[in-house]
Amino acid sequence: MSRVGLLVLGPAGAGKSTFCNSIISHMQTIGRRAHIVNLDPAAEPSKYEFTIDIRDLISLDDVMEELDLGPNGALIYCFEYLMKNLDWLDEEIGDYNDEYLIFDCPGQIELYTHIPVLPNIVRHLQGQLNFNLCATYLLEAPFVIDSSKFFSGALSAMSAMILLELPHINVLSKLDMIKDEYGKKKLKRFLNPDAMLLANEADQNLNPKFHHLNQCIANLVDDFGMVQFLPLEANNPESVATILSYVDDVTQWAEAQEQKEPKDQIDIEDL
């Protein structure tokens, strides 16, 4: 059985920790073992205990207090310290060969755009520890239901996809917060979006000088295949199971077992 890791990425407030807890709960229900690896030195308490916690090595509050750094500077310092002490991470991971490790990552995008911290950790996990990795990038549905904000979120997800060079699954989280307010037809347009159509909608509320920029961004999103998001309701077991089936497929978990293909289409009516 493969050594599998799932990186949970996305901006602050996207529901990453809730998603991690939902995956753990679902796996316990179906008899699979998984552990959460907390890579956020500023993490809040979780429903499930972290099996591995970066705060046992270094914490954001301690760095801010001792070095008089702001939150972002302290976060970067924490990860630079982790990179110098990867033997600690190796020892903590130990022999989790037959179980999922779910890496709950911080929301600051600069950790993989401005400095190569997360990409270096990914390479270490793949090269030294022989992990099959998959990245999930969460965007919250109440935020991206606006066309212009959708493109902002899609570009941040694309940055993660390109810089981490991992199999990549985009997730539209907190769908339960808006599915009663917006019609199914409108929600489907964001799960399987027509980038050019959304760009035209965004143009209606912008100065005409930005129209060409919108079209270029839409073309970029289309070219990189950022055309589908999986819907997530964290309290809906079927929603969580569908996303897990995609993760299993791209990581080739338990190749010896009978493979179950993920759904070809995501239907909002199933939620």
From Swiss-Prot:
Species of provenance: Candida glabrata (strain ATCC 2001 / BCRC 20586 / JCM 3761 / NBRC 0622 / NRRL Y-65 / CBS 138) (Yeast)
Gene3D superfamilies: P-loop containing nucleotide triphosphate hydrolases
Short sequence motif Gly-Pro-Asn (GPN)-loop: positions: 70-72
Protein family membership: Belongs to the GPN-loop GTPase family.
Pfam families from the UniProt entry: ATP_bind_1
Listed GO biological process terms: mitotic sister chromatid cohesion; protein import into nucleus
Function: Small GTPase required for proper nuclear import of RNA polymerase II and III (RNAPII and RNAPIII). May act at an RNAP assembly step prior to nuclear import.
Protein name: GPN-loop GTPase 3
Oligomeric form and interacting partners: Heterodimers with GPN1 or GPN2. Binds to RNA polymerase II (RNAPII).
